[in-house]
Amino acid sequence: MSHLSTINACKLLLFRRCLQAVLLTVGIQFLLLTIFLLFVNFQLLRPLHWISVTLSLVCSMYTWFASIPLVGAVVLYGMILCQQHLAERLYCPTRFRWLVHYAPRKLLFLAAHLLVGYLTAWLYTGYMHTDYRHLWYKCYDQECISAYHVYLLGMGIFAGCYYFVSVHMRQEVEIEFPIVNHLWGEKLREVLYSSLARSLIKSLLPTLAYTLLFWLFGGVVCHKLSHIFAVDLDERLEGFFGVATNGRLLFYGWLLTSQILSNMHLMRCFYSMFLSEEFPLAITKNRAAFVQEKEVTVVAALGLSNVYVVQCLAAKYLYNLVTAGDAEKRSELFQLTEPGNRPANWRSLCDQCLSLFGNFTDELIDSMQKISVLKGSPSSPPLTPISENASASLMAERVLTRQYNQMHGIRAIVSPRSNAVIDRPVDRIHRVPDWCERTSMQLEQSLQLLINRIPGIVYMFTEPEGAKTAFLLTHSLPLVFVIQALSQICVFSLKEDRYGVVQTDLPDIIRSMSRLKGELDKLSSVASNLRGPGSSFSVLRGAVRRSLFHICVAFGEYLSELIPSGEELHQLQTVINQE
């Protein structure tokens, strides 16, 4: 299978999982609506009537038709979330490049958040009391703008904006791989309980913040709406006490905010649940497969660096395969394949893993050169300039040699014309005057300082220190799984590798891990100052140290044969002693 067909096959499978997440999210909308109606229509003395009325409202035709706009917004939200999961993770060195690449996508995602928040508030207000249900109501035999309805609609928009700013504005969507695999029903129940309970607490701050904003600017908004629709102004929420003392309105706003936040959090969790499921990969390429069958191997999936999700799933699959304790499945890695009885499976896997190690380490070294604390390029010794006395003595020696040759009739090897060219004084070479060079350098430095003093230029068009290093560490999850899987393969090869296909590559594997460990040790002094990758750095460094330790312990008797005596062998022995 070609590289392009591998990408298409993986994206098609992930797109199907995203559709399943969207369908589950649509079903959850009715569960959230049921919970909201149970709170709004609460009747302690008539519990059966309370539950029956709530269920009849959820199952009514009005609910099914009124929820169509919200379902459409949820589907749009899910498609944008799917696109962000499958998009390539590009590094933007400057903030201007980040705006050019990510701003259109972020603006579209913000619009989806606002739309879901507004339509959720619009749908839920239809089940409240008459004062909250419509945009205007009868007051003193006239039509008036309902400030309660405006407050709740604005609360929905503000809740969607709040979730986008706090979760998605500066961060990319990530998949959380569970440490312990549970049944699908257990995971769904855990996500529902935790999301609903957490949203009740997290919705307090945005509710209070929006209430303060509505007290400051709500009157202006209601006045504009009354002027647009040619109706009277509602005066029930004028002043601070008019807003702060309305307990029912504040309760509805808090409950609505918690529903919107939990809804968006559940959509994010559902995508993580479906996309983190085990990917159907193969170790050995089935040569007898039909042409229509698109079988993706682990090696091919690990090579898809432009689809980060697939690379993570392939690395996780390899890690689970090695650590599951099934020796029969691991034997596919060591077996010899036809034709030629060559270790094709191990050869391709080892080359791909070493390529991942090498590329990541090289990029990490290049990015660390831009950190001022770690900057240390090897300096070459300066060239010794020729002094004027040495130049004069050389010219005098040439003149004496020419006179001696003419006196004794010795011809020159080269023609006199060539001698004239060679003996031309160095001072006659045309050079740019020193004052011109100094002037041009001063002008260049002055212009650069002038540009840097313009507000926003340095902020927008300069690469922050350590940004590339932070980007690499944040996206190092595939490397964490691959390093641990490869070390376990090397350890198991002592008993399961009957042909010795792994031992020939052990020196290269140890050197690659040791090289990466050395660079991470250098970075440990400044990792806390980098923005974002603190936990990622700790996880990666711990995985490298642990993997190298397992290999060194398993092959401790043979280290001197695998690695020649020297600094590398001393470092490996130090790793064993430290652990």
UniProtKB/Swiss-Prot annotation:
InterPro entries: Nucleoporin_prot_Ndc1/Nup. One of its GO terms (molecular function) is protein-macromolecule adaptor activity. It is a multi-pass membrane protein. Residues 43-60, 128-144, 224-236 are perinuclear space. Keywords: Membrane, mRNA transport, Nuclear pore complex, Nucleus, Protein transport, Translocation, Transmembrane, Transmembrane helix, Transport. It comes from the Eukaryota. Its main location: nucleus. GO terms for biological process: mRNA transport; nuclear pore organization; protein transport. Residues 1-21, 82-106, 166-202, 258-579 are cytoplasmic. One of its GO terms (cellular component) is nuclear membrane. It is found in: Nucleus, Nuclear pore complex; Nucleus membrane. Belongs to the NDC1 family. Component of the nuclear pore complex (NPC), which plays a key role in de novo assembly and insertion of NPC in the nuclear envelope. This is Nucleoporin Ndc1.
